[in-house]
Amino acid sequence: MEPIYVTGHRNPDTDSIVSAMAYAALQNAIGERDYVPARLGHISDETQLVLDRFGFEPPVRIQTMRTQVRDLDYDTPPALSGAVTVSRAWAALQSNKAKSIPAIPVTNENGELYGMLSPSEIASYDMRTLSDSRVDKIPVFNLLSVLDGKILNESGYLADTISGEVSIALPQNNENLLFKGPDAIVIVGEQPEMARRAVEQQVSCLIVCQAELPEQLRQMQTNTCIIATPFDAYKAARMIYYAIEVARVCRTDDLEAFHLTDFVDDVREVVLKSRHRSYPILDENDKVVGTLSRYHLIKPRRKRVVLVDHNEAAQAVPGLEQAEIVEI
């Protein structure tokens, strides 16, 4: 429940401080709402003496009642690590929690903002793969994850990443092979002869779909990473492209981010001049805590305040016009 601040006047004297503390304590004792005593200036020596005499801490000091980003009902989608796969990122975008959110943040290893990801970035990447079949430096762990696969030749020297042109091997003569050398990722089915040729060519990776690999091929000394998957060749070929890290797909340029302490008036001016649909929100340590969109700014939740020991706006907390006055 959002707190209700109880404040006296500016340049507070002892009456103003004690009135705020007493009224907040009374309301907390008889009700279910959270009342917080607050002050609008420094504690005088006299007031501090009174507080010390009866064992009370001074009320929290507030500077303004202007609406801040922290007061908005902003979205809190799960932030994605830049190291997760595009496949997992897509699943996150399609989750119930994120379906209505235009974009979700991508973070670095420290939880700081790295980029923003929306379905349009994934769609754009997907279209690029139609004209460029090559992939570079896919972590083997990611590939195993998206293919639901397992390595069949763990005894060989295997790299941590794989690169190359992706091709589905079809039965054909050796001289007409579509792949050659280590710069290839080859997908085969129940084709032991084609699998043997791929291993002899020392391709970067051999993916065996819905088939068993002959034992002699498993025992061959090779640098080829051999992976078995329950997927068919077409699905395996598509999933390879979704194994790359989402940090290589997300938008990293022209990022607009706001902090929890930013005022909504200032945020609104920036948003109205921008074409982005979703904006990351950062805390005081620059960690991602959520996102906001234009509709969050339409009717922001106002801070609530009770005025004691005064009733003039000129003596009240700055930004009072943006607050909801609960009582005077």
Regions found by a protein language model. Give the residues of each.
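Beta-strand/loop-dominated core regions that host nucleotide or nucleotide-derived cofactor-binding catalytic loops
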Residues: 97, 118-121, 125-136, 171-173, ...
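Protease-associated
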Residues: 128-193
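Feature captures the catalytic cores and cofactor-binding loops of soluble hydro-lyases/lyases
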Residues: 46, 168-250
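Short linear loop/turn motifs
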Residues: 61-71, 137-142, 233-236
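Low-complexity, flexible helical/coil segments
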Residues: 71-76, 139-145, 151-156, 202, ...
